[in-house]
Amino acid sequence: MCPSGRIAIPITTTANPNFRPAFEIIDTDHDGKISSDDLRAFYAGIPSGENNDETMIGTMISVADANKDGFVEFDEFEKVLETTPFSRSGNGGDDGLMKDVFKVMDKDGDGRLSYGDLKSYMDSAGLAVTDDEIKSMIRLAGGDLNDGVSFDGLLKIFGC
């Protein structure tokens, strides 16, 4: 235990590649760390509007920010997700976070990610992908070009 009464959690340097895509989506300015501005921008894409509360954003940063620099680096992000029980499978991760990612990507709110949804989001996130790569993602997720990808399919794409 630290003198402050907090428990020290060692941060590993072995990155879990399953969390990298989620981190890159939330890191909207692509500077390698998640800031309060990144979270505001991320949650602005979710139709409910309730998730951009400043107190909640501050809490999210402070919970994950192990080195107290005001940002969440990938290793800190990874540590939070690895220690949070995955409500569906127990594999480690945050189902709620992934649902938020899904909502941001689902532009028309129909509960499925279409080819257009995936292409649009990848472009807006600065991730250069070809049409064939988008089609491969849809196939990997168990979807097709007509029906798109479900939430569970998105988890397959991210390797969760």
UniProtKB/Swiss-Prot annotation:
Binding-site residues, Ca(2+) 3: 106, 108, 110, 112, 117
Biological process according to GO: hyperosmotic salinity response
Distribution of this protein across tissues and organs: Expressed in roots and flowers.
GO molecular function (one): calcium ion binding
Binding, Ca(2+) 2: 65, 67, 69, 76
Role summary: Binds calcium in vitro.
Name of the molecule in the record: Calcium-binding protein CP1
The encoding gene: CP1
